[in-house]
């Protein structure tokens, strides 16, 4: 059985970890970084770029560079939060799919579901793991925000499937961070608050870590959050400030200039990071735009105090879910023994200060906010594989689940913060005499009014025998698995007739859709390999042309005019071939140039060897005394000392 890898699929960055023996290890990507930007770009040449390569070209390709896709995954286009995101943040097209989901589209009109785009990031993670382990990887534990609903969880599983991964478990991000902390911690019983402010989402979980019969038991007592609050919003606040200041100075609004907007977005993110350690920073963007009077430059000084004033309401927004989580756990602030900060945005001093004020204690600084979640996912993978034996994880469902009953009311069967897996049944009846069927409308949320909650799906239980209203007994059962994914069944107790629904297509993707996307992904992988091979052939050809011409120049009179002409002709033919897309033609012309140059190279080498031999014979004198040799100590310099 292969390794089950742990992936933190983040809004801004993603991270990969695996179990190495008894410890979890974060794996560096091909570029040597421990985190990978969750950015996917589609280039004009048809290449798909993922991570740093995609992020680097975002300024010149804003329409086809997709970031923060996690904020759209498993969501409907008409969601208020999605509409706000479209208005404020993204330069790419967000469209309404046939099923009402929020999808994205390239400027060429190619439509893609968010799980399809996220799958590209997961595929890069999968390849990184395979390169490191030297074996195929097919199974993963993927993390999601604790406050993700059923649709978003299922859409994340779909993304894994499209990427060629069997998702063995979906685990909540704060729970994963607590798992990473709890496995290393040997302090006995603790009640930990995990404050997780990432790139696009915020979660707070109250978690109890206890030693039960020698096992580390990690039990989630409550969870709360906001799936539209994160570092991207902090970037946006600063970006809008910079644009407004520029408009005051120059009278030009950059909001409608996609290229300028992307440059300001990147500068805002960079300035935000700098202001975590510096009191002020300069945002300097030359040639940001131009008008009739000439080019315009953006140069604005931003102080930490100014930035904090711009985002203070965002930080305060995160404290309300903290209060609710404590209430749901039945605890007070004084009951919390440790506060863990997770997510890159928690590096901001104002966030740390407000969290300290709220809980009345200093948050721990020994947990890496970028890596803890992936480490926890890898540990959970180790538990599932049987490699980690002394850990028991008890997670919860973040939102209440129920059905719509008479009068448009939501009747809850499973309350929020119930430990999962769990199963709950309740008996309902008909609302009218001789009612032949009932519709089971499955809902998720906390509102009393059914229409105000998230609809997960509906199904009918038909062929109910005629009876007065209130007489038939319809038993509805909700069954949630360890991934937080729901199975609902309804049974007529009189006839034994049963109907059920697995809420698995709530992401809007059917099995056929997913299978098609898997095939597309495999086809893309083949196309990517062909493109890579073509580029390699071109690079080899370019190097050979350069080295051949340089050698002819250096050899001068030692090469005849006929030989020079033959080499130049072969170089020109190879240059012409590299302008096309025929890899075999490039390789054939490369071979032709190599064969044309080989006799010249051999002749030059023979002459060089002969000259060197003659020179060596003339200088065969007594060796020089080693009086100038100095003894020295050498020290291996580690990478971080270089």
Swiss-Prot record:
Residues 609-642 are annotated as: Disordered. It comes from the Bacteria. Residues 628-642 have a biased composition (Acidic residues). Transmembrane segments: none annotated. Gene3D superfamilies: 1.20.1270.10, 3.30.420.40, Actin, Chain A, domain 4, Substrate Binding Domain Of DNAk, Chain A, domain 1. InterPro entries: ATPase_NBD, Chaperone_DnaK, Heat_shock_70_CS, HSP70_C_sf, HSP70_peptide-bd_sf, Hsp_70_fam. Coiled coil: none annotated. The modification Phosphothreonine is found at residue 201. GO terms for molecular function: ATP binding; ATP-dependent protein folding chaperone; unfolded protein binding. SUPFAM superfamilies: Actin-like ATPase domain, Heat shock protein 70kD (HSP70), C-terminal subdomain, Heat shock protein 70kD (HSP70), peptide-binding domain. Keywords: ATP-binding, Chaperone, Nucleotide-binding, Phosphoprotein, Stress response. Induction: By stress conditions e.g. heat shock. HAMAP family: DnaK (MF_00332). Acts as a chaperone. Belongs to the heat shock protein 70 family. This is Chaperone protein DnaK.
